[in-house]
């Protein structure tokens, strides 16, 4: 899991594996193995170097939800986390769009993203979020739980 989070931050920063390894002072081979999940227990020293280079808090590398809730401001962070969870768990884009449209009708405040309603015109933004979802493992159960909570 931590490897996927490192990869997500690395890509957001626009770094190649080689660039991150050089700037962090870590082995490119080891970094690659961490990202691919071959090694799943990197040292704290390694994580400190990588997180400093990526300009993220060390704690953010340990928990995908922490990362998503702390990095993004406003109400969209919860949506982003749960969209990522839904797609990672195998929910198809069209199914997710249908689901969120149904929720929009039932609970209008839960179907906004960046203070806008989910529509055909902004579906590309949602698709971009779903692409990020493939980088982080989250569950459909957590999406449903979140949506129930937001609907109260």
From Swiss-Prot:
Chain segments annotated as transmembrane: none
InterPro entries in UniProt: Bact_TransReg_Diox, Cro/C1-type_HTH, Lambda_DNA-bd_dom_sf, SinR/SinI_dimer_dom, SinR/SinI_dimer_dom_sf
One Gene Ontology molecular-function label: DNA-binding transcription factor activity
Xref: SUPFAM superfamilies: lambda repressor-like DNA-binding domains (SSF47413), SinR repressor dimerisation domain-like (SSF47406)
Known role: Represses sigma(D)-dependent flagellar genes and activate the eps and yqxM operons. Repressor activity is regulated by SlrA. Controls the initiation of biofilm formation.
Domain HTH cro/C1-type intervals: 6-61
Organism name: Bacillus subtilis (strain 168)
UniProt-recorded name of the protein: HTH-type transcriptional regulator SlrR
GO process annotations (BP): regulation of DNA-templated transcription
Domain Sin, first and last residues per copy: 113-151
Subunit and partners: Component of the SlrR/SlrA complex.
Keyword line: DNA-binding, Transcription, Transcription regulation
CDD domains: HTH_XRE
Superkingdom, natural source: Bacteria
PROSITE patterns: HTH_CROC1, SIN
Ranges annotated as DNA-binding: 17-36
């Amino acid at each position: 899991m931590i490897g996927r989070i490192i990869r997500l931050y690395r890509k957001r920063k626009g770094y190649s594996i080689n660039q991150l390894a050089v700037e962090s002072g870590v082995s490119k081979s080891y970094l690659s193995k961490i990202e691919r999940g071959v090694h799943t227990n990197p040292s704290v020293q390694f994580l400190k170097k990588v997180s400093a280079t990526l300009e993220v808090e060390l704690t953010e590398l340990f928990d995908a939800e922490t990362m998503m809730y702390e990095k993004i401001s406003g109400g969209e962070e919860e949506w982003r986390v749960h969209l990522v969870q839904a797609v990672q768990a195998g929910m198809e884009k069209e199914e997710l769009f249908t689901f969120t449209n149904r929720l929009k009708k039932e609970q209008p405040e839960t179907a906004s993203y960046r203070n806008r309603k989910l529509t055909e015109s902004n579906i590309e933004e949602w698709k971009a979020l779903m692409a990020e979802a493939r980088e982080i493992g989250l569950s459909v159960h957590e999406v449903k739980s979140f949506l129930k909570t937001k609907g109260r």
